[in-house]
Amino acid sequence: MFILNFNKMKNVKLLLMLGTAALLAACSNEADSLTTSIDAPVTASIDLQSVSYTDLATQLNDVSDFGKMIILKDNGFNRQVHVSMDKRTKIQLDNENVRLFNGRDKDSTSFILGDEFAVLRFYRNGESISYIAYKEAQMMNEIAEFYAAPFKKTRAINEKEAFECIYDSRTRSAGKDIVSVKINIDKAKKILNLPECDYINDYIKTPQVPHGITESQTRAVPSEPKTVYVICLRENGSTIYPNEVSAQMQDAANSVYAVHGLKRYVNFHFVLYTTEYSCPSGDAKEGLEGFTASLKSNPKAEGYDDQIYFLIRWGTWDNKILGMSWFNSYNVNTASDFEASGMSTTQLMYPGVMAHELGHILGAEHTDNSKDLMYATFTGYLSHLSEKNMDIIAKNLGWEAADGD
């Protein structure tokens, strides 16, 4: 006799339902996993206690179009940074191509990667920190000695807070290899008692409003991204380190991209060459006038007067002047007769000088906001905050600032 066992059937149905649910859940999890693997950036970590050129290059070369999550670790310090490649900015240092990478605004972190060097920069507790690494050991040792030399004279007990050599963790011998250096710029300036520099009288007004910025010269939305060429000429006899000049270039480009959303419409292309010109004295005004005259008389520069030029040196000029430029001298629609030019120091301890002088070239005036890039005294802040300045920069780059940008 066949007797239906309802309890047993209920159990079978329950098992079937559970099995189906498990299968659906598995499919759902697989789909979620697939979506995550496609959309989520890869996560990696960098140990700052032993960071080298190879470490930075390996991680940065692997940054995809989706970006990449990199965790910076240092003895209890952990920062997760979403890193994206800056595809708008091109840098050529002689024969070396350099790529830039930025974190999100809240990350306050940026990277620079060249064929022979790499730089990591970030802010921590309001202080600017840089890690600098070179690929070749000889050059790495030279850079380490260059930055260490001023501290040897101070004998400061807190020197390590400002400057530190990073050694290869795999080397166990007494003579460990230096793979990078760490510099806390804010602490270093205090220990070394570096002078406070200002930007007062750091620009020259042209005889007339250069190439009159008129409504007819602007357009609401550019038809395509405009490439702005910035030609940086190494002053004759001046030593320029690629990690320093590329950082100045990165700050200059980022300062403009942040203005009214210009990063959608502007590309910067920086190149570095050497010039035979050198300033005849320490007078910055005289130096800039001579530099502009040398460009006008150089047959190789003929036909390139629509570009921006910088004379760069490692040092400063008389009266602690960090740079000098022709004010409001560039408009994207007209040639400038080489007056869209300036001078800038490349010193690591004074970030953003090229960005400040570029601001003047694009028409930005000094402000009374100490957190503004265009503040008259050097503070190290890297962003334009004045609406008036940002509007004139946008006009000089060829269009009106759109509402809501």
Swiss-Prot record:
Q: Show which residues constitute the signal peptide.
A: 1-25
Q: Which GO terms describe its cellular component?
A: extracellular region
Query: Could you tell me what this protein is called?
Result: Fragilysin
Q: Please list the residues that make up the active site.
A: 357
Instruction: Enumerate the UniProt keywords alphabetically.
Output: Hydrolase, Metal-binding, Metalloprotease, Protease, Secreted, Signal, Toxin, Virulence, Zinc
Keyword Transmembrane (UniProt):
no
State the reactions this protein catalyses. Broad proteolytic specificity, bonds hydrolyzed includes -Gly-|-Leu-, -Met-|-Leu-, -Phe-|-Leu-, -Cys-|-Leu-, -Leu-|-Gly-
Q: Which family does it belong to?
A: Belongs to the peptidase M10C family.
Primary role = Diarrheal toxin that hydrolyzes gelatin, azocoll, actin, tropomyosin, and fibrinogen.
Short name of any one Pfam family annotated for the protein: fragilysinNterm
Q: What are the recorded Gene Ontology BP terms?
A: proteolysis; symbiont-mediated disruption of host mucosa
How cofactor binds (record note)? Binds 1 zinc ion per subunit.
Q: Where does Zn(2+) bind?
A: 356, 360, 366
Subcellular localization, as worded in the UniProt entry: Secreted
Q: Which GO terms describe its molecular function?
A: metallopeptidase activity; toxin activity; zinc ion binding
Question: Domain of life here?
Answer: Bacteria
Annotated InterPro entries: Fragilysin (IPR001843), Fragilysin_N (IPR032273), Fragilysin_N_sf (IPR038176), MetalloPept_cat_dom_sf (IPR024079), Peptidase_Metallo (IPR006026)
Summarize the pH-dependence annotation from the UniProt entry. Answer: Optimum pH is 6.5.
